[in-house]
């Protein structure tokens, strides 16, 4: 299967917006390969089901969920509710879905409800949840951005692949890359690139590192 001319559903724990993290970049890049990509926002209360066009090949889906605390129930019951939600989303998309690419374990542990040829569970963070075992067992492939993340699935009988975070072509092109933001080019400059909105970012340790290395300049880059 080539990743072109497919209908792809991306299940994201972060909403579509101005700040992009890995899920948003995957959606954008996959849409550039002539795929029709549907980016599923986290479920929200009191929101009408909708499909917003971002580009000709990229759409954002908002949907309402009347079910709360679903992951406290047995898997057999969750499966029934997930079938209902999947049917609702397929109606919104109005296409058969070729690939379900899920970045979080909380909404659809039983990915087969979408009747897709390919299902991927792709954690880029460590999720401390019992339901993660269910989605790992039911996905066809498991991707992960680090060995530490993937080691948690060593006992799951699935094909597992390490997929590092990507780098935009912009940063590899010296003609496009701007370094004008560097104040002191003759000093040692330290860069941190990542999701600065991450709720578990160890700000105290970062502050200690900066204060104990005053001879260096630090640049934090990211949403």
Residue ranges and their predicted role:
Residues 182-201, 207-210, 218-221:
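Conserved donor-binding/catalytic core segment of Leloir-type glycosyltransferases
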Residues 148, 165-166:
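Carbohydrate-associated surface elements
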Residues 99-102, 111-127:
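Active-site proximal beta-strand in glycosyltransferases
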Residues 38, 101, 138-146, 160-161, ...:
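A short beta-strand/loop micro-motif in the catalytic core of glycosyltransferases
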Residues 47-94:
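A conserved catalytic-core segment of Leloir-type glycosyltransferases
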Residues 84-92, 108-109, 113, 125-145, ...:
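Membrane-proximal helix-turn-helix segments that form the acceptor-binding/catalytic region
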Residues 130-133, 167-186:
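Acidic anion/phosphate-binding donor-loop and adjacent secondary structure
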Residues 1-48, 210-213, 217-218:
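N-terminal subdomain of nucleotide-sugar transferases
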């Amino acid at each position: 299967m080539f990743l072109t001319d497919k209908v792809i559903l991306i299940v994201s724990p972060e909403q579509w917006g101005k700040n992009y993290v890995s899920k948003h970049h995957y959606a954008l890049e996959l849409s550039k390969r002539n795929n029709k990509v549907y980016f599923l926002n986290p479920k929200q209360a009191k929101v009408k089901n909708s499909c917003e066009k971002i580009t000709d090949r990229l759409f954002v889906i908002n949907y309402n969920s009347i079910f709360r605390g679903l992951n406290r129930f047995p898997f057999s019951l969750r499966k029934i509710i997930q079938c209902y939600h999947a049917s609702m989303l397929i109606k919104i998309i109005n296409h058969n879905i070729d690939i379900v690419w899920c970045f979080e374990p909380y909404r659809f542990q039983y990915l087969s409800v979408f009747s897709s040829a390919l299902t991927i569970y792709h954690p880029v963070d460590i999720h401390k949840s019992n339901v993660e075992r269910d989605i790992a067992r039911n996905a066809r492939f498991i991707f992960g951005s680090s060995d530490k993340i993937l080691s948690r699935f060593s006992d799951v009988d699935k094909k597992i692949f390490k997929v590092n975070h990507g780098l935009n072509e912009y940063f590899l092109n010296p003609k496009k890359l701007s370094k004008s933001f560097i104040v002191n080019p003759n000093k040692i400059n330290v860069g941190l690139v990542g999701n600065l909105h991450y709720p578990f970012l160890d700000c105290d340790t970062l502050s200690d590192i900066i204060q104990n290395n005053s001879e260096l300049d630090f640049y934090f880059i990211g949403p």
